[in-house]
């Protein structure tokens, strides 16, 4: 009797007793995602590492909501983009447990999964229905490795890509419109091609007025100039490798060379002064300061540009997608990150991290995430009229996410990136050599790395 009584109490307390003895019916994904188990004993807080930027602030607000609901404190620890990767991989090489989760760059998937840093989330994302709540492209880019394997290491958290902001008051000024048409023979409007982008950039470059055509990425740290250049490269028909992962003849193809020459021409003719080492902060600052007519940036940084307390031109700021290249191709560099669980933390902490992601992935919380300014990957939220009309840049974002491409995400991506950052910077900013020579060196070094690493098929 005593055994029966104690067993009955344990089973009831643990929620294992089913009403009427019947098996519980299968529940839809949203219902499965919203049923949070009690937190593992002793887990009072969770630590999430991310880069230092506005979306991390928004995630902290989401974390505060979680604390109100569960009592578990969520700390979003922010590290500047330039040192974010170094900090993370140094911690991982020591199998550190300072962080329970990381909102890691899409390019980290190969290295972090192959080296055992990330927890395999395939069963978790599948059994909860979370896998089916996000768009397929974001699941592929932010969660899956190897490509096409159906193995998932991250929850798509911050969808992102490069786009452009422009000064509507300049573009729509009747005098400017007349002068532009007189000079170039077509109407002044957001550019649809890189040739038009160059024309418009030249037209608005007026040093005597402290006005310049563009602010584009040039920074040597992390992946800035590589991301900026690949916006042009992909749209010009270039790529980092062919289907067999051969870089030679692809990175240094005529299409890629033409794209790099265009990127340097934009820098030489029309870049605002002081932007020889520019990334997202500097391009936004140049726009806010009234220095440029057009500014390249990730969509994640555009909320500041529509905030009149930050940007004096907020009411006159418009947005357009990355233009087409000469052959009609149109792509944009992928940004964005997925949320992954660190494999070195205890099983209890891993479960607590899963509980947080399960809660975060609910449609209602993803709607909150989007409302704060996070770029949700949730299919329902992205398709909602509420999202598309919530911000002036959201329609361009939704369009851009249909033609994104990314840099490498294989385990040696960091070595490949260092080569491209160095060579592109030396040519575009440093003025060393020709575009062909710069891309020849990248192609040669990349080819050797890919062959030595066994990645060439």
Q: Where does each model-flagged region fall?
A:
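Glycine-centered hinge/linker elements that transmit conformational signals in sensory
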Residues: 196-204, 236-238, 243-277, 322, ...
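Short, polar/charged alpha-helical segment
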Residues: 4, 33-37, 54-73, 169, ...
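Long, aromatic- and glycine/proline-rich binding clefts that accommodate carbohydrate-like moieties
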Residues: 21-40, 45, 317-324, 370-422, ...
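Extracytoplasmic/periplasmic substrate-recognition and gating elements
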Residues: 64, 69, 145-150, 169-170, ...
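Hinge/lid segment of periplasmic solute-binding proteins
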Residues: 3, 10, 14-40, 106-165, ...
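Short, solvent-exposed loop/beta-turn-alpha elements that line the ligand-binding surface or hinge
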Residues: 18, 25, 35-41, 122-137, ...
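Extracytoplasmic/periplasmic solute-binding protein
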Residues: 143-158, 162, 194-249, 292
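Extracytoplasmic "Venus flytrap"/periplasmic binding protein-like
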Residues: 61-141, 154, 174-175, 286, ...
């Amino acid at each position: 009797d005593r055994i029966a009584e104690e067993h009955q109490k344990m089973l009831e307390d643990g929620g294992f007793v089913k009403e009427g003895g019947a098996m519980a019916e299968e529940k839809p994904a949203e219902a499965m995602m919203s049923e949070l188990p009690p937190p593992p004993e002793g887990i009072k807080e969770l630590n999430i590492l991310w880069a230092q930027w506005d979306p991390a602030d928004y995630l902290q607000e989401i974390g505060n909501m979680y604390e109100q609901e569960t009592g578990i404190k969520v700390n979003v620890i922010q590290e500047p983009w330039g040192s974010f990767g170094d900090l993370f991989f140094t911690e991982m090489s020591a199998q550190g447990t300072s962080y329970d989760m990381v909102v890691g760059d899409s390019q980290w998937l190969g290295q972090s999964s192959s080296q055992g840093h990330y927890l395999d989330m395939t069963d978790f994302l599948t059994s909860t229905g979370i896998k089916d709540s996000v768009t397929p492209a974001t699941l592929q880019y932010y969660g899956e490795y190897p490509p096409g394997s159906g193995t998932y290491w991250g929850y798509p958290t911050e969808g992102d890509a490069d786009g452009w902001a422009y000064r509507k008051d300049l573009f729509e000024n009747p005098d400017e419109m007349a002068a532009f048409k007189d000079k170039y023979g077509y109407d002044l409007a957001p550019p649809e091609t890189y040739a038009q982008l160059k024309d418009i950039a030249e037209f608005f470059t007026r040093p005597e007025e402290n006005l310049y055509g563009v602010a584009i990425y040039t920074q040597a740290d992390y992946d800035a100039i590589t991301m900026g250049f690949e916006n042009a490269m992909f749209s010009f028909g270039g790529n980092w490798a062919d289907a067999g992962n051969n870089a030679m003849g692809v990175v240094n193809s005529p299409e890629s060379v033409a794209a790099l020459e265009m990127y340097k021409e934009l820098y030489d003719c029309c870049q605002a002064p002081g932007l020889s080492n520019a990334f997202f902060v500097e391009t936004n600052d140049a726009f806010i300061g009234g220095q440029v007519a057009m500014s390249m940036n990730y969509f994640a940084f555009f909320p500041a540009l529509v905030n009149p307390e930050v940007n004096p031109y907020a009411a006159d700021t418009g947005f357009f997608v990355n233009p087409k290249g000469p052959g009609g191709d149109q792509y944009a560099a992928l940004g964005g990150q997925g949320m992954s669980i660190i494999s070195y933390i205890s099983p209890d902490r891993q479960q607590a991290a899963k509980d947080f992601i399960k809660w975060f992935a609910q449609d209602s919380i993803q709607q909150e995430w989007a409302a704060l300014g996070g770029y949700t990957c949730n299919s329902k939220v992205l398709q909602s009229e509420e999202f598309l009309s919530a911000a002036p840049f959201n329609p361009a974002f939704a369009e851009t996410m249909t033609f994104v491409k990314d840099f490498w995400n294989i385990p040696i991506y960091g070595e490949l990136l260092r080569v491209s950052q160095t060579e592109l910077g030396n040519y575009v900013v440093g003025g060393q050599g020709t575009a062909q020579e710069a891309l020849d060196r990248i192609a040669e070094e990349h080819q050797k790395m890919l062959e030595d690493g066994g990645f060439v098929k």
